[in-house]
Amino acid sequence: MEEYFDVLDEEGMPSGITKPKSEVHTKGYWHRTVHIWIINENNEILLQRRSNTKKRNPNILTISCEGHVSAGESSIQGAIRELDEELGLKVKNEDLKYIKSIKRAENRATNYYNNEFKDFYILRTNVKVEEIIYQKEEISEVMYVTWETLKDIIHTNEVIIREYSYDILEDYFKNKS
């Protein structure tokens, strides 16, 4: 069954209209997504490798967890659901630190528009890689990397992390000390 999203206005407020995912992307409706960086006690960052069955960017390392906010969900509810669905992590509202929201309009292909309000969160947790029960249809592996390693690999063909997402993580590390 196709996912439905709340259509947002240009300011990120709900319009009261819901549309199926396919229509949201073909018509370019504004909608909300969540992006969660997971960081352990050693300040290592969890990355996921996208499954080789993914249509876009298969076998590529990316942010710890991300996904669309479903119709009727708040941003934090969407983040909690995505962490559970993708990584099997059970978290509560207070476990997530909201960082910021950015507005991005991206035309990735003919008749495919990604007009999103992207909400970023940090999850500090000491979950071990072997404890993560990831969604096999979405993810082929997860791994922790140091900040230095991430800086070294960020511009390689093995990683797809948008510059704005990387910048948010970099600001977090600069401001936390």
Regions found by a protein language model. Give the residues of each.
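Nudix hydrolase/Nudix homology domain
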Residues: S22, N59, A71, Y98-A105, ...
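Short, charged/polar surface micro-motifs in flexible loops or helix N-caps
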Residues: I39-I45, T53-K55, R104, N126-K128
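A short coil-to-beta-strand element that immediately follows conserved catalytic motifs
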Residues: K90-K100
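Conserved Nudix-box catalytic region and its N-terminal flanking loop in Nudix hydrolases
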Residues: E23-V34, E44-R81
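Short helix-to-loop capping/linker segments positioned immediately adjacent to catalytic or ligand/cofactor-binding
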Residues: G12, E86-K90, E106-N111, E130-E131
